[in-house]
Amino acid sequence: MATLGNHPELPANIESMLEADVSTLFLKAGCVPRTKRGMIGNIILCDVDGEKDWTNIEMEQLQGDLESLIEGNPERHDCFREIDRTGCLVLQIGDLRITCAYPPFSDAREITIVRPVAKLSLSEYDLHSKLIGRLSDHHRGVFI
């Protein structure tokens, strides 16, 4: 599992927006980039200072750059394309989960980059012992 900050170097303009207190970066064609920042319990959504609206071409270029990062790091088990469907792409790049959406899935090209905010172990959840037993015995099924 990747640790916080453990990812291949992203394009400089993206790395600069992913400051230490940023958990999520939202990019959308025709809009100013926004971040979700702060600690759990005190999170705010704000525009990125000094940034202009991103164009569709810039968004396409960034998506291509992100896909190239995966192709350029075949030795990393934490860099892969998880979902690739018409209008939707989900990438794991180190500790970052990245979603790319575009028409017809969304009304405009969007990229969301999410960092992990907490890493909890199973024991930190208030779960019934039967459920913990089922999970640890490798039973199959859906966990909701």
PLM-predicted stretches and their roles:
Residues D49, W54, S68, G72-G141:
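P-loop NTP-binding catalytic core
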Residues I144:
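Hydrophobic anchor at the beta1->P-loop junction of P-loop NTPases
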Residues M1-E82:
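N-terminal anchoring/assembly modules that precede and organize ATP-driven motor systems
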